[in-house]
Amino acid sequence: MDNVDSDQTKPIPAYYCCYLLRSTVNKRAGLYVGSTPNPPRRLPQHNGLSKGGAKKTATKNRPWEMVLLVEGFMSRTAALQFEWAWQHEDSRHMSKGEPGNTKRRQRPRRSLTANLEKLHSLLQSPCFSRWPLNIRIFASDVYQLWRVWCDRANGTIPEHIRTIPDGNCPHNSPEPETDHPRVGSIDGIQTDYSKIQDYLEKAVFLLDDPNELHCKVCEAQAKPEKELVIVCPQASCFGISHLLCLSARFLKSSNDPNQLVPRSGTCPACSKLVQWPLMMQELSFRTRGGKEVQVILRKKARSDKRKAAAARPAEIDANTASNEPLESTAQAFDRLNENVHQDVLDEDWAEELDCASEDDTNERLKTGSKDQQRVEIVIEDSDEDDLEFL
Protein backbone atom coordinates (compact mmCIF):
# COMPACT_ATOMS: atom_id res chain seq x y z
CA MET A 1 0.00 0.00 0.00
CA ASP A 2 2.87 2.36 0.70
CA ASN A 3 4.09 2.05 -2.88
CA VAL A 4 0.61 2.72 -4.27
CA ASP A 5 0.12 5.78 -2.06
CA SER A 6 3.59 7.02 -2.97
CA ASP A 7 2.83 6.70 -6.70
CA GLN A 8 -0.22 8.93 -6.24
CA THR A 9 1.89 11.81 -4.90
CA LYS A 10 4.65 11.67 -7.52
CA PRO A 11 4.72 12.94 -11.09
CA ILE A 12 4.11 10.42 -13.83
CA PRO A 13 7.58 8.95 -14.50
CA ALA A 14 9.53 10.35 -17.41
CA TYR A 15 10.03 6.75 -18.53
CA TYR A 16 9.16 3.28 -17.21
CA CYS A 17 9.27 -0.05 -19.01
CA CYS A 18 9.21 -3.81 -18.65
CA TYR A 19 12.02 -5.63 -20.44
CA LEU A 20 13.07 -9.04 -21.69
CA LEU A 21 16.73 -10.02 -21.23
CA ARG A 22 18.45 -12.74 -23.26
CA SER A 23 21.89 -14.25 -22.80
CA THR A 24 24.39 -13.48 -25.57
CA VAL A 25 26.52 -16.48 -24.61
CA ASN A 26 23.79 -18.99 -25.27
CA LYS A 27 20.61 -17.45 -26.58
CA ARG A 28 18.65 -20.55 -25.59
CA ALA A 29 20.06 -20.71 -22.08
CA GLY A 30 17.95 -18.21 -20.23
CA LEU A 31 15.48 -15.36 -20.37
CA TYR A 32 14.77 -12.75 -17.74
CA VAL A 33 11.76 -10.47 -17.27
CA GLY A 34 12.06 -7.26 -15.26
CA SER A 35 11.06 -3.59 -15.05
CA THR A 36 13.01 -0.35 -14.70
CA PRO A 37 12.79 3.43 -15.18
CA ASN A 38 16.30 3.47 -16.65
CA PRO A 39 17.32 0.70 -19.10
CA PRO A 40 20.77 2.24 -19.90
CA ARG A 41 21.65 2.00 -16.22
CA ARG A 42 19.94 -1.34 -15.52
CA LEU A 43 21.62 -3.41 -18.25
CA PRO A 44 25.20 -2.83 -16.96
CA GLN A 45 23.97 -3.84 -13.51
CA HIS A 46 22.70 -7.16 -14.83
CA ASN A 47 26.03 -7.68 -16.59
CA GLY A 48 28.06 -7.01 -13.45
CA LEU A 49 29.61 -3.79 -14.75
CA SER A 50 28.07 -1.80 -11.90
CA LYS A 51 26.53 -2.66 -8.57
CA GLY A 52 22.88 -3.46 -8.09
CA GLY A 53 22.09 -6.22 -10.59
CA ALA A 54 19.69 -9.02 -9.72
CA LYS A 55 21.25 -12.14 -8.24
CA LYS A 56 19.57 -14.40 -10.77
CA THR A 57 21.46 -12.78 -13.64
CA ALA A 58 24.86 -13.09 -11.92
CA THR A 59 25.58 -16.33 -13.79
CA LYS A 60 27.77 -17.74 -16.54
CA ASN A 61 25.12 -16.58 -19.01
CA ARG A 62 26.53 -13.05 -18.88
CA PRO A 63 26.60 -10.82 -20.82
CA TRP A 64 22.89 -10.21 -21.26
CA GLU A 65 21.13 -8.10 -23.88
CA MET A 66 17.79 -6.30 -23.69
CA VAL A 67 15.98 -7.56 -26.75
CA LEU A 68 12.50 -6.17 -26.10
CA LEU A 69 10.94 -3.33 -24.10
CA VAL A 70 7.30 -2.65 -23.28
CA GLU A 71 7.20 1.14 -22.83
CA GLY A 72 4.69 3.70 -21.64
CA PHE A 73 3.77 2.74 -18.08
CA MET A 74 2.30 5.65 -16.14
CA SER A 75 3.59 4.51 -12.74
CA ARG A 76 5.93 2.02 -11.08
CA THR A 77 2.91 0.13 -9.73
CA ALA A 78 1.51 -0.32 -13.23
CA ALA A 79 4.84 -1.66 -14.51
CA LEU A 80 5.11 -4.13 -11.63
CA GLN A 81 1.59 -5.40 -12.27
CA PHE A 82 2.41 -6.04 -15.92
CA GLU A 83 5.76 -7.61 -15.05
CA TRP A 84 4.18 -10.05 -12.60
CA ALA A 85 1.51 -11.04 -15.11
CA TRP A 86 4.17 -11.59 -17.80
CA GLN A 87 6.18 -13.82 -15.48
CA HIS A 88 3.26 -15.99 -14.36
CA GLU A 89 1.50 -17.98 -17.05
CA ASP A 90 -1.39 -18.86 -14.74
CA SER A 91 -2.07 -15.18 -14.02
CA ARG A 92 -5.74 -14.17 -14.05
CA HIS A 93 -4.74 -11.43 -16.51
CA MET A 94 -4.16 -14.12 -19.15
CA SER A 95 -7.07 -16.44 -18.46
CA LYS A 96 -9.10 -17.11 -21.60
CA GLY A 97 -11.60 -19.65 -20.31
CA GLU A 98 -14.22 -19.68 -17.61
CA PRO A 99 -13.17 -20.30 -13.99
CA GLY A 100 -12.65 -24.00 -13.43
CA ASN A 101 -12.20 -24.79 -17.13
CA THR A 102 -8.60 -23.62 -17.42
CA LYS A 103 -5.96 -26.14 -16.41
CA ARG A 104 -2.75 -24.90 -14.90
CA ARG A 105 0.34 -26.12 -16.67
CA GLN A 106 2.51 -28.35 -14.52
CA ARG A 107 5.63 -26.81 -15.99
CA PRO A 108 5.49 -23.32 -17.51
CA ARG A 109 6.90 -22.91 -21.00
CA ARG A 110 9.99 -20.71 -20.86
CA SER A 111 11.19 -20.32 -24.43
CA LEU A 112 11.41 -17.05 -26.33
CA THR A 113 8.32 -18.02 -28.30
CA ALA A 114 6.41 -18.70 -25.09
CA ASN A 115 7.37 -15.29 -23.70
CA LEU A 116 6.20 -13.55 -26.85
CA GLU A 117 2.98 -15.57 -26.75
CA LYS A 118 2.37 -14.47 -23.15
CA LEU A 119 3.12 -10.87 -24.05
CA HIS A 120 0.69 -10.98 -26.97
CA SER A 121 -2.03 -12.39 -24.71
CA LEU A 122 -1.46 -9.71 -22.07
CA LEU A 123 -1.76 -6.91 -24.60
CA GLN A 124 -5.15 -8.29 -25.65
CA SER A 125 -6.44 -8.73 -22.10
CA PRO A 126 -9.02 -6.31 -20.63
CA CYS A 127 -6.53 -5.46 -17.88
CA PHE A 128 -3.86 -3.99 -20.16
CA SER A 129 -5.28 -3.54 -23.67
CA ARG A 130 -6.33 0.07 -23.02
CA TRP A 131 -3.00 1.17 -21.52
CA PRO A 132 -0.84 3.59 -23.58
CA LEU A 133 1.90 1.05 -24.26
CA ASN A 134 4.37 0.45 -27.09
CA ILE A 135 6.72 -2.42 -27.91
CA ARG A 136 10.32 -1.63 -28.86
CA ILE A 137 12.41 -4.53 -30.23
CA PHE A 138 16.21 -4.36 -30.60
CA ALA A 139 16.99 -7.83 -32.04
CA SER A 140 16.03 -8.68 -35.62
CA ASP A 141 15.32 -12.36 -34.88
CA VAL A 142 13.01 -11.39 -32.02
CA TYR A 143 11.27 -8.87 -34.26
CA GLN A 144 10.71 -11.46 -36.99
CA LEU A 145 9.41 -13.99 -34.46
CA TRP A 146 7.08 -11.37 -32.99
CA ARG A 147 5.65 -10.54 -36.43
CA VAL A 148 5.12 -14.23 -37.20
CA TRP A 149 3.37 -14.75 -33.89
CA CYS A 150 1.12 -11.70 -34.36
CA ASP A 151 0.08 -13.06 -37.77
CA ARG A 152 -0.76 -16.54 -36.55
CA ALA A 153 -2.15 -15.85 -33.06
CA ASN A 154 -5.85 -15.65 -32.33
CA GLY A 155 -6.94 -12.06 -31.96
CA THR A 156 -4.97 -8.89 -32.52
CA ILE A 157 -3.49 -6.35 -30.17
CA PRO A 158 -5.12 -2.88 -30.17
CA GLU A 159 -4.12 -0.48 -32.93
CA HIS A 160 -2.82 2.14 -30.50
CA ILE A 161 -0.12 -0.27 -29.25
CA ARG A 162 2.71 0.22 -31.74
CA THR A 163 5.62 -2.11 -32.46
CA ILE A 164 8.86 -0.16 -32.97
CA PRO A 165 11.66 -2.04 -34.80
CA ASP A 166 14.95 -0.76 -33.42
CA GLY A 167 18.56 -1.86 -32.90
CA ASN A 168 19.61 -4.24 -35.66
CA CYS A 169 16.08 -4.72 -36.97
CA PRO A 170 15.99 -4.10 -40.74
CA HIS A 171 15.58 -0.46 -41.70
CA ASN A 172 13.09 -1.41 -44.37
CA SER A 173 10.70 -2.35 -41.58
CA PRO A 174 7.64 -0.11 -41.34
CA GLU A 175 8.85 3.13 -39.79
CA PRO A 176 7.25 4.03 -36.44
CA GLU A 177 5.46 7.29 -35.81
CA THR A 178 7.57 10.37 -35.19
CA ASP A 179 6.48 10.29 -31.54
CA HIS A 180 8.34 6.99 -31.18
CA PRO A 181 11.48 7.16 -33.36
CA ARG A 182 14.27 4.59 -33.46
CA VAL A 183 16.99 5.22 -30.87
CA GLY A 184 19.56 2.70 -32.15
CA SER A 185 20.42 1.05 -28.85
CA ILE A 186 19.48 0.88 -25.19
CA ASP A 187 21.86 3.77 -24.49
CA GLY A 188 19.82 6.01 -26.77
CA ILE A 189 16.66 5.81 -24.67
CA GLN A 190 15.70 9.14 -23.12
CA THR A 191 14.77 8.54 -19.49
CA ASP A 192 14.45 12.11 -18.15
CA TYR A 193 11.95 14.94 -18.54
CA SER A 194 14.02 16.90 -21.07
CA LYS A 195 11.69 15.74 -23.85
CA ILE A 196 8.84 17.82 -22.38
CA GLN A 197 10.84 20.88 -21.30
CA ASP A 198 9.60 23.05 -24.20
CA TYR A 199 6.03 21.97 -23.47
CA LEU A 200 6.51 22.59 -19.75
CA GLU A 201 7.97 26.06 -20.31
CA LYS A 202 5.06 27.03 -22.54
CA ALA A 203 2.51 25.78 -20.00
CA VAL A 204 4.06 27.65 -17.07
CA PHE A 205 4.31 30.84 -19.13
CA LEU A 206 0.69 30.65 -20.33
CA LEU A 207 -0.66 30.04 -16.83
CA ASP A 208 1.28 33.01 -15.45
CA ASP A 209 -1.75 35.33 -15.68
CA PRO A 210 -4.84 33.42 -14.46
CA ASN A 211 -7.14 36.42 -15.02
CA GLU A 212 -6.88 36.00 -18.78
CA LEU A 213 -7.42 32.24 -18.91
CA HIS A 214 -10.60 30.65 -20.21
CA CYS A 215 -11.38 27.00 -20.89
CA LYS A 216 -11.69 26.23 -24.61
CA VAL A 217 -14.43 23.69 -23.87
CA CYS A 218 -16.79 25.36 -21.38
CA GLU A 219 -15.48 28.93 -21.93
CA ALA A 220 -15.51 29.58 -18.18
CA GLN A 221 -12.54 31.15 -16.43
CA ALA A 222 -9.75 28.70 -15.60
CA LYS A 223 -8.03 29.03 -12.24
CA PRO A 224 -4.73 27.08 -12.23
CA GLU A 225 -4.17 27.76 -8.54
CA LYS A 226 -7.44 25.99 -7.66
CA GLU A 227 -8.20 23.71 -10.61
CA LEU A 228 -6.34 21.21 -12.77
CA VAL A 229 -5.75 22.97 -16.08
CA ILE A 230 -4.39 21.33 -19.23
CA VAL A 231 -2.34 23.09 -21.90
CA CYS A 232 -2.24 21.87 -25.51
CA PRO A 233 1.14 20.24 -26.29
CA GLN A 234 1.26 21.64 -29.84
CA ALA A 235 4.04 24.25 -29.93
CA SER A 236 2.01 26.83 -31.85
CA CYS A 237 -1.23 26.38 -29.87
CA PHE A 238 -2.07 28.37 -26.75
CA GLY A 239 -5.32 26.62 -25.89
CA ILE A 240 -6.05 25.60 -22.31
CA SER A 241 -8.88 23.54 -20.84
CA HIS A 242 -10.16 22.22 -17.55
CA LEU A 243 -9.05 18.63 -17.00
CA LEU A 244 -12.61 17.32 -16.59
CA CYS A 245 -13.96 19.33 -19.53
CA LEU A 246 -11.37 18.05 -21.99
CA SER A 247 -11.55 14.50 -20.65
CA ALA A 248 -15.33 14.39 -21.14
CA ARG A 249 -14.96 15.82 -24.66
CA PHE A 250 -12.36 13.22 -25.65
CA LEU A 251 -14.35 10.32 -24.18
CA LYS A 252 -17.49 11.42 -25.99
CA SER A 253 -15.66 11.65 -29.31
CA SER A 254 -14.17 8.16 -28.89
CA ASN A 255 -17.60 6.50 -29.26
CA ASP A 256 -16.46 3.78 -26.85
CA PRO A 257 -18.78 3.51 -23.81
CA ASN A 258 -16.32 1.19 -22.06
CA GLN A 259 -13.42 3.63 -22.24
CA LEU A 260 -12.83 5.34 -18.89
CA VAL A 261 -9.60 7.23 -19.62
CA PRO A 262 -8.96 9.05 -22.91
CA ARG A 263 -6.04 8.04 -25.12
CA SER A 264 -6.13 10.94 -27.55
CA GLY A 265 -8.40 13.59 -28.98
CA THR A 266 -8.66 16.74 -31.06
CA CYS A 267 -7.61 19.96 -29.37
CA PRO A 268 -10.59 22.37 -29.25
CA ALA A 269 -8.26 25.30 -29.98
CA CYS A 270 -6.04 24.11 -32.85
CA SER A 271 -8.01 21.03 -34.03
CA LYS A 272 -4.87 18.87 -34.02
CA LEU A 273 -4.63 15.39 -32.56
CA VAL A 274 -3.06 15.39 -29.08
CA GLN A 275 -2.07 12.49 -26.84
CA TRP A 276 -3.68 12.28 -23.41
CA PRO A 277 -0.75 10.50 -21.65
CA LEU A 278 1.63 13.29 -22.72
CA MET A 279 -0.67 15.97 -21.34
CA MET A 280 -1.08 14.07 -18.07
CA GLN A 281 2.68 13.70 -17.73
CA GLU A 282 3.19 17.45 -18.13
CA LEU A 283 0.32 18.26 -15.76
CA SER A 284 1.52 15.86 -13.06
CA PHE A 285 5.09 17.12 -13.29
CA ARG A 286 4.03 20.78 -13.26
CA THR A 287 1.83 20.27 -10.18
CA ARG A 288 3.89 17.66 -8.29
CA GLY A 289 7.46 18.17 -9.44
CA GLY A 290 8.22 20.90 -6.91
CA LYS A 291 11.49 22.74 -7.38
CA GLU A 292 12.57 20.25 -10.03
CA VAL A 293 10.31 22.24 -12.36
CA GLN A 294 12.45 25.30 -11.73
CA VAL A 295 15.65 23.31 -12.23
CA ILE A 296 14.64 21.96 -15.63
CA LEU A 297 13.33 25.25 -16.95
CA ARG A 298 16.29 27.27 -15.71
CA LYS A 299 18.53 24.84 -17.56
CA LYS A 300 16.47 25.41 -20.67
CA ALA A 301 16.63 29.18 -20.18
CA ARG A 302 20.43 29.04 -20.03
CA SER A 303 20.51 26.84 -23.12
CA ASP A 304 18.21 29.22 -24.98
CA LYS A 305 20.42 32.17 -24.04
CA ARG A 306 23.51 30.43 -25.39
CA LYS A 307 21.76 29.57 -28.65
CA ALA A 308 20.43 33.10 -29.02
CA ALA A 309 23.85 34.62 -28.35
CA ALA A 310 25.45 32.37 -30.96
CA ALA A 311 22.82 33.29 -33.54
CA ARG A 312 23.06 37.08 -33.14
CA PRO A 313 25.81 39.43 -34.29
CA ALA A 314 28.41 40.10 -31.61
CA GLU A 315 27.31 43.71 -31.14
CA ILE A 316 23.78 42.73 -30.10
CA ASP A 317 23.30 42.09 -26.43
CA ALA A 318 21.76 38.62 -26.31
CA ASN A 319 20.71 38.99 -22.69
CA THR A 320 18.56 42.04 -23.41
CA ALA A 321 16.62 40.23 -26.11
CA SER A 322 16.01 37.07 -24.12
CA ASN A 323 15.50 38.23 -20.54
CA GLU A 324 11.95 39.57 -20.78
CA PRO A 325 10.06 36.30 -21.38
CA LEU A 326 12.37 34.45 -19.02
CA GLU A 327 11.62 36.90 -16.22
CA SER A 328 7.91 36.30 -16.63
CA THR A 329 8.47 32.55 -16.62
CA ALA A 330 10.64 32.78 -13.51
CA GLN A 331 7.85 34.62 -11.72
CA ALA A 332 5.50 31.82 -12.69
CA PHE A 333 7.99 29.29 -11.28
CA ASP A 334 7.92 31.02 -7.89
CA ARG A 335 4.13 31.13 -7.74
CA LEU A 336 3.89 27.54 -8.89
CA ASN A 337 5.96 26.34 -5.98
CA GLU A 338 4.58 28.51 -3.18
CA ASN A 339 2.21 25.78 -2.05
CA VAL A 340 4.38 22.81 -2.97
CA HIS A 341 5.40 20.50 -0.13
CA GLN A 342 8.90 21.17 1.14
CA ASP A 343 10.02 17.59 0.42
CA VAL A 344 11.65 18.27 -2.93
CA LEU A 345 14.14 16.75 -5.29
CA ASP A 346 17.70 17.65 -6.05
CA GLU A 347 18.59 18.51 -9.62
CA ASP A 348 19.92 15.04 -10.41
CA TRP A 349 17.09 13.03 -8.89
CA ALA A 350 16.24 11.33 -12.18
CA GLU A 351 19.76 9.89 -12.28
CA GLU A 352 19.36 8.37 -8.81
CA LEU A 353 16.09 6.49 -9.09
CA ASP A 354 16.44 3.52 -6.80
CA CYS A 355 16.11 -0.13 -7.72
CA ALA A 356 14.77 -2.50 -5.08
CA SER A 357 17.71 -4.77 -5.85
CA GLU A 358 20.25 -1.97 -6.05
CA ASP A 359 21.92 -1.94 -2.68
CA ASP A 360 24.23 0.90 -3.55
CA THR A 361 21.54 3.43 -4.45
CA ASN A 362 19.63 3.64 -1.19
CA GLU A 363 21.38 6.71 0.24
CA ARG A 364 19.33 9.84 0.86
CA LEU A 365 19.92 12.73 -1.53
CA LYS A 366 21.96 15.44 0.16
CA THR A 367 21.53 19.18 -0.05
CA GLY A 368 24.01 21.96 0.53
CA SER A 369 22.19 23.09 3.68
CA LYS A 370 22.76 21.30 6.95
CA ASP A 371 19.49 22.57 8.41
CA GLN A 372 17.21 21.48 5.59
CA GLN A 373 16.49 17.82 4.82
CA ARG A 374 14.93 16.60 1.64
CA VAL A 375 12.98 13.42 1.14
CA GLU A 376 14.09 11.42 -1.91
CA ILE A 377 11.47 10.53 -4.47
CA VAL A 378 12.28 6.94 -5.42
CA ILE A 379 11.22 4.98 -8.47
CA GLU A 380 12.52 1.47 -8.06
CA ASP A 381 13.39 -1.37 -10.36
CA SER A 382 11.76 -4.65 -9.52
CA ASP A 383 13.53 -7.25 -7.46
CA GLU A 384 11.16 -10.10 -8.16
CA ASP A 385 11.95 -10.78 -11.78
CA ASP A 386 11.73 -14.31 -13.09
CA LEU A 387 14.77 -16.00 -14.65
CA GLU A 388 13.62 -18.56 -17.14
CA PHE A 389 15.58 -21.60 -18.28
CA LEU A 390 14.75 -24.11 -20.92
UniProtKB/Swiss-Prot annotation:
GO terms for molecular function: 5'-flap endonuclease activity; crossover junction DNA endonuclease activity; zinc ion binding. Residues 35-58, 307-326, 357-378 are annotated as: Disordered. Residues 14-99 form the GIY-YIG domain. Gene3D superfamilies: GIY-YIG endonuclease (3.40.1440.10), Zinc/RING finger domain, C3HC4 (zinc finger) (3.30.40.10). It is an enzyme of class 3 (hydrolase). Keywords: DNA damage, DNA recombination, DNA repair, Endonuclease, Hydrolase, Metal-binding, Nuclease, Nucleus, Zinc, Zinc-finger. Residues 362-374 have a biased composition (Basic and acidic residues). The keyword Transferase does not apply. Its main location: nucleus. Signal peptide: none annotated. GO terms for cellular component: Slx1-Slx4 complex. It is found in: Nucleus. Its cofactor is a divalent metal cation. A zinc finger (SLX1-type) spans 215-270. Pfam families: GIY-YIG, SLX1_C. The keyword DNA-binding does not apply. Its EC number is 3.1.-.-. GO terms for biological process: double-strand break repair via homologous recombination. Catalytic subunit of the slx1-slx4 structure-specific endonuclease that resolves DNA secondary structures generated during DNA repair and recombination. Has endonuclease activity towards branched DNA substrates, introducing single-strand cuts in duplex DNA close to junctions with ss-DNA. Forms a heterodimer with slx4. Belongs to the SLX1 family. This is Structure-specific endonuclease subunit slx1. It comes from Aspergillus terreus (strain NIH 2624 / FGSC A1156).
